[in-house]
Amino acid sequence: ILEKNLYGLDIDDRAAQMAGFAMLMKASADDRRLFTATDDAGNLQPPKLNVLSLQESKGLSVDELATHLAPFKVQRTTITALVETFEHAKTFGSLIQIPYALKTHLAVLPQVLALVKQSGDMYASAAADDLLPLVQQAQVLAMQFDAVVANPPYMSEKFMNCLV
């Protein structure tokens, strides 16, 4: 349930951490082996939560990312779409709509970026590290859900910036 059915997004890093912690504590009350589960090789396998803090793409250079990821067939248009989509992620949060052109690349992009990280190319690996959080949050935002529980914003008008 934790890994396949529950997803969470927040614009506040601490709120996302607390949500993940609360989910793990609630689950550990029902399953004492939650934190000691191992794979076939005996390695600890804690649950992988899908609770993310939305990250902005401010400061990322499309040119630099495209240059380092081009040898791995990561398209410049895909990088541009990711960077532009999440430029104001902390402001708009889950209101962000993932463009259809980007949705078509989201299925293979994590595997490609994992291969980039294993390639040994230091600059390409750093570019993949910069792009991976954006890909993960785009995947969650592109999904369709049967039920959504949302928290209304608490911001008063005097704190709203010009984008809102």
Name each model feature, range by range.
Residues 1-164:
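SAM-dependent methyltransferase catalytic region
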